[in-house]
A protein has these predicted regions:
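Short, solvent-exposed coil/turn linker segments
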Residues: 69, 74-81, 96-98, 151-166, ...
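Acyl-thioester-dependent acyl-group transfer interface
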Residues: 1-60, 80-104, 248-437
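Amphipathic repeat-derived elements
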Residues: 112-117, 121-123, 128-134, 138-141, ...
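Acyl activation and transfer enzymes in specialized metabolism, enriched
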Residues: 30-50, 120-137, 212-254, 399, ...
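Acyl-thioester-dependent condensation/acyltransferase catalytic cores
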Residues: 39-137, 141-145
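ATP-dependent carboxylate/phosphate-activation module, predominantly the ATP-grasp catalytic core
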Residues: 66-67, 212, 355
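Non-catalytic, low-complexity flexible loops and terminal extensions
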Residues: 1-9, 13, 113, 126-134, ...
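Short, well-ordered loop/turn elements at secondary-structure boundaries
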Residues: 113-115, 228-229, 348
Length: 437
């Protein structure tokens, strides 16, 4: 496990020294599990996944993953009452890790009536939403009595080390990088508009709040069918709904450019056939800028989002967004370095953020306890007024709109969220016009 952090991991690690970048994945269940079984399941997870028993050490001023004996850093279930569990999970988004192992936490919220919530909080440098959800689900399956084999998984290289661009010649890879950054420059020249009145600068204090929304199984299936009929994706239509919700806050209808920051899963384009079972940070933050007319069409916008993201992913360029942090000359760990990285990250077009970990099939544990829902939340970067997280489960969608209360008012955040859901409902029901929630 002992290796230097890759560029993406190092960026997230440095930014985490400025503002907490945790994410949490959680499930709601109709039943309970024994604490001893949970602890054994978490021990098995640590045996399998080297990053769950690693700390971030400083070697010559640079961050390295360093293995720690499991007995020195066991991952144990923290048991709490069910009351106010959502509030306490939101607080975890702003409760930093120290860099010591384990770089994850497990919470069990239980109460009367048999309902419970299981959650895992991750330091973002060791995982992304997709792989974090897989760790949680496997732990619950084991705790529920399923005899999953414990297979030691070798530590995976960073996203940069698995990028196919490394197998190209110097000239070819340089041309590819140049083309990518020219494209980013063209996107910047479209002058995307920021949410009026929003200050993207990092503030001394943060107060993260999450607003949950649910799209039912029936509506989720109808939305998927509508996406297929319009030759786009669920992420495309969710992104379009989000852009139009922001657009509704921008004053009188007129043509303007708005941007969307999508966290894209890179497992399909990196080497080594990675899957969700490979714990790690294998995502790219991709910003696309879109023209929004005075009478915008949701489906046209959804197709544009799908097309631009697909082009970046299939061209092999998606991972290059983090190449502004060169591997050969990694910045030393310091608040000054972190501020330089934050300043570079903030140079992109002003955008809201959308991250979607895909769909999980319905699951009932071996002991008969059904999982009712799966969702996740992430601490929003300061340059984005809102961050919307999406997890599909059993055909439905579980969304959270996250924002910093010190920078965005509760009423406006609620208004944006309600508009977003309104546009989703309009996409499902053809009798509703797509330009109004």
């Amino acid at each position: 496990m002992n290796r230097r952090l890759g560029s993406t991991e190092a960026i997230y690690y440095l930014l985490d020294t400025l503002y907490c970048l945790n994410f949490v994945v959680f499930v709601e269940m109709d039943g309970t599990l024994e604490r001893a079984n949970l602890d054994r399941a978490l021990q098995a997870a640590q045996q399998e996944k080297p990053l769950l028993r690693a700390r971030i050490a400083q070697v010559d001023g640079h961050p390295f993953f360093e293995a720690v004996p499991m007995e020195q850093a066991p991952l144990k279930a923290q048991v709490q009452t069910l009351r106010n569990w959502r509030l306490r999970l939101a607080e975890q988004l702003d409760t930093p890790f120290t860099g010591e192992a384990p770089l994850a936490r497990f919470f069990w919220f239980g109460g009367r009536g048999g309902q419970s919530v299981a959650a895992m909080v991750f330091h973002h440098a060791i995982a992304d939403g997709k792989s974090g959800a897989q760790v949680l689900v496997d732990a619950l399956r084991r705790a529920g009595g399923e005899d999953l084999p414990v297979t030691l998984q070798a530590a995976r290289p960073s996203a940069q080390d698995l990028d196919p661009i490394n197998s190209k010649g110097v000239v070819e890879s340089t041309v590819q990088k140049l083309g990518f950054w020219l494209g980013q420059g063209r996107a910047t020249l479209k002058f995307a508009q920021q949410l009026p009145g929003y200050d993207p600068q990092l503030q001394a204090q943060r107060s993260i709040k999450a607003i949950p929304y649910t799209v039912s199984k029936e509506k989720g299936r109808a939305l998927l069918a509508a996406c297929r009929a319009h030759d786009t994706t669920v992420h495309g239509v969710l992104g379009a709904a989000q852009i139009l919700a922001i657009n509704s806050e921008c004053g009188a209808p007129e043509e303007r450019h708005l941007a969307l920051n999508s966290l894209a899963d890179l497992r399909g384009v990196l080497r080594d056939n990675l899957s969700a079972d490979d714990l790690g940070l294998y995502i790219a933050t991709l910003t696309t800028v879109h023209a929004v007319g005075a009478s915008p069409d949701l489906w046209q916008l959804a197709k544009s989002i799908k097309s631009e993201l697909s082009s970046l992913l299939h061209s092999g360029d998606a991972n290059l967004i983090h190449s502004f942090y060169p591997r050969a000359s990694l910045l030393p760990t310091s608040r000054h370095s972190a501020r330089l990285v934050q300043a570079a990250a903030a140079l992109g077009p002003p955008a809201s953020m959308l991250t979607n970990i895909g769909n999980l099939q319905p699951l009932t544990l071996r002991n008969g306890v059904p999982i009712r829902s799966l969702a996740f939340m992430v601490s929003p970067p300061p340059q984005h007024p809102i961050c919307v997280t999406v997890a599909g489960y059993a055909g439905g969608l579980h969304l959270h709109l996250l924002y910093d209360q010190t920078k965005l008012g509760d009423a406006q955040a609620q208004r944006i969220g309600n508009a977003l859901i309104g546009f989703i409902d309009a996409a499902i029901d053809p009798s509703n016009p797509s330009e109004k929630p």
